[in-house]
């Protein structure tokens, strides 16, 4: 029952947000999605139309956070496009906003491996997300067109734990990245 800030990237109609709202009674929940299909309203739920592929929209969202003195999130959930490049770009843009002890969660990060028709935008010269998570855990630098060595070293310094879990559905893989 403590006050926490949650950010969900990719809210769709807001079903997850509704469960967060009822479970975390004092949470302020921020939702960003490029489509407005959101079906819930509350003074504790803030929806922003934001396509995280468009830097100007991310910039506007960050300005809103700064203007309202929202400096951190206890939890950030990336349930957005599930595409490789979007996942890594979101991680680089938002992970620093996690409070100490908080979690950055990535849902369904193996979609392109399981659904052959799903967009696989993994560059041929890049390692996949599973390998990135292993390297982050081992604190070993890796080649990436998105996560530069400066950001990787930041992660090595602040990540305390990385846990991957298999969900009930075939494509459901989720990772919890905890910040020290």
Predicted regions and their residues:
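S-adenosylmethionine/decaboxylated-SAM
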Residues: 1-180
């Amino acid at each position: 029952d403590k006050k926490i800030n949650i950010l969900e990237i990719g809210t769709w109609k807001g079903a997850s947000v509704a469960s967060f709202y009822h479970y975390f009674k004092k949470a302020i929940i921020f939702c960003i999605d490029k489509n407005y299909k959101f079906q819930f309203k509350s003074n504790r739920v803030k929806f922003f139309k934001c396509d995280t592929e468009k830097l100007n929209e991310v910039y506007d969202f960050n300005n809103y956070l700064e203007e309202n003195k929202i400096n951190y999130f206890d939890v950030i959930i990336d349930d957005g496009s599930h595409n490789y490049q979007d996942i890594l770009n979101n991680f680089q843009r938002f992970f620093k906003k996690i409070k100490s002890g908080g979690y950055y969660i990535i849902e369904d990060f193996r979609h392109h491996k399981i659904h052959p028709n799903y967009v696989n935008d993994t560059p041929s010269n890049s390692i996949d997300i599973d390998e990135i998570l292993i390297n982050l855990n081992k604190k070993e630098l890796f080649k990436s067109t998105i996560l530069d060595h400066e950001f990787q070293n930041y992660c090595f310094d602040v990540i305390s734990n990385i846990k991957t879990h298999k969900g009930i559905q075939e494509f459901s893989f989720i990772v919890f990245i905890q910040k020290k």
